[in-house]
C-alpha cells in the first residue's frame, strides 16, 4: 500500500497531473520528471525550494530527449505521455534501468503503430498514442497503469482502461486516481478496475 504521508510517489503524481494543466501551482521538486516534462513543452520556474508549474509552455520538440536517470517510474510514466502530447522521443536510461521490463506496453503501442528502437542505454519511441480501449495486467508494476491514466485524458476522444486481476499495487493506482480527480480530470469507474476516461 502507498505511504500515508505525501512522499516522492505522491509528489511525482502531483507534478505529472499539473504539468499540462492551465494555471500555476507550487509543488516540491521531482528532478527526473521535471526534466522530462520540460522536454515535452511543460513550463516551470523555481521559487524557494519548490516548482511553480506554469502548464504547457509550448509544443514539444519533434523528437525530444528525456533523461530518466535510474527512475523506473519516470520512464514508465513518461513513455505514454510523450506519445500523447507529441510523437514520442528518446529516453536515456542510467544504471540498471535499461534492464527493467517494459513489455506490458507492447500490445498498446503496437495497436497504435508506435515503433520502438533500442540502442544501448537509449529507447526511442516514434508514433502517436490514440484513444481506444486498452487492457493492462494487474500483476505487474502499477507504474504502467499510472502512465496510461495520465496519458489518455490528453488525447482527443474517449478511452477505456481495464486492469486484469489480480491487482498487486492497488494503493498506488488509487493514489493516481485521486490526483487526477483533484485536478478536475474525470475518470469514471465502469467496473472492477475498469475506467472510462474522457479525452480533451
Question: Locations of the language-model features?
Answer:
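Structural preference for solvent-exposed beta-strand-turn elements
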Residues: 1-200
Amino acid at each position: 500500500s502507498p505511504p500515508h504521508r505525501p512522499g516522492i510517489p505522491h509528489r511525482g503524481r502531483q507534478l505529472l497531473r499539473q504539468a499540462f494543466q492551465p494555471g500555476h501551482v507550487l509543488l516540491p521538486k521531482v528532478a527526473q520528471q521535471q526534466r522530462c516534462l520540460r522536454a515535452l513543452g511543460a513550463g516551470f520556474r523555481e521559487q524557494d525550494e519548490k516548482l511553480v508549474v506554469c502548464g504547457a509552455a509550448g509544443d514539444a520538440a519533434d523528437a525530444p530527449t528525456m533523461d530518466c536517470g535510474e527512475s523506473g517510474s519516470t520512464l514508465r510514466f513518461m513513455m505514454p505521455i510523450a506519445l500523447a502530447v507529441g510523437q514520442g522521443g528518446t529516453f536515456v536510461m542510467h544504471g540498471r534501468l535499461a534492464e527493467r521490463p517494459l513489455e506490458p506496453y507492447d500490445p498498446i503501442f503496437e495497436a497504435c503503430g508506435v515503433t520502438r528502437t533500442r540502442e544501448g542505454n537509449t529507447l526511442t519511441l516514434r508514433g502517436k498514442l490514440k484513444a481506444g480501449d486498452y487492457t493492462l495486467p494487474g500483476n505487474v508494476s502499477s507504474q504502467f497503469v499510472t502512465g496510461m491514466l495520465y496519458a489518455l485524458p490528453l488525447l482527443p476522444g474517449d478511452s477505456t482502461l481495464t486492469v486484469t486481476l489480480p491487482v498487486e499495487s492497488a494503493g498506488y493506482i488509487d493514489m493516481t486516481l485521486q490526483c487526477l480527480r483533484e485536478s478536475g480530470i474525470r475518470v469514471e469507474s465502469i467496473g472492477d478496475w475498469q475506467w472510462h476516461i474522457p479525452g480533451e
